[in-house]
Amino acid sequence: VTTDLLAATAELVDIPSVSRHESLLADHIAAALAGCDWLHLDRLGDNVVARTSLGRDRRVVVAGHLDTVPPNANEVSRVEGDTLWGVGSCDMKGGLAVMLDLAHSLEEPTSDVTWCFYAREEVNRDEGGLLEIFDQQPDWLAGDAAILCEPTDGVVEAGCQGTTRVVVRMGGVRAHTARPWAGRNAIHRLGPVLDRVTAWGGRSVVLDG
């Protein structure tokens, strides 16, 4: 594995991995990690997981997805100065290159580390590689903290909380617009629900003090 992250990312960009077609990149990742004797390597479909087992008192999961959105005449990597162009170069083969470099260089990290390269993030959640691992091999993802290598312009975003999807059903009674008092407006009844959602301030997440 090269320590030139720009070249390493370009190499990954040139391996096509549109969602549901990540097998070539998964093969490449698995082969790149196979020589790391300090890592236990597992594979589930196109998901590749490599773990240290050093007996540390905590474990950090470092994860990144293999897939990209469909290309738009940008299949082949192109370097201009210190800028790399190509499908997935930002989201998120740059992160994958960093993960590979660290996995090769950190033989004895202060925390045990799980390196998780997973498939199908850019599509419906039900198809996601992370969900596939959680369903079939949840122990592979056990950890005390997780770092996702999504692009953030170099800013650490701590404690991302995901999303909540709620289905609310409000009944109503039809009426003519000239006589609204004869009916019951289901949309208006949603007002207090939206007020409560808007008023919720979220929660403060603290990681490692």
Model-identified regions with their sequence ranges:
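Acidic/His- and Gly-rich active-site-bordering loop/insert found
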Residues: V1-S89, E108
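Active-site metal-binding loops of divalent metal-dependent hydrolases
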Residues: L66, P151, T177
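Metal-dependent peptidase/peptidase-like ectodomains
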Residues: A145-A146, V155-R189
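Acidic/histidine-rich catalytic neighborhood of metal-dependent amide-processing enzymes
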Residues: A97-R165
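Predominant activation on well-ordered alpha-helical scaffold segments within soluble catalytic domains
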Residues: A10, A30, A97-H104, L131-F134, ...
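Acidic-enriched catalytic cores of C-N bond-cleaving enzymes acting on peptides and small amides
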Residues: A178-G209
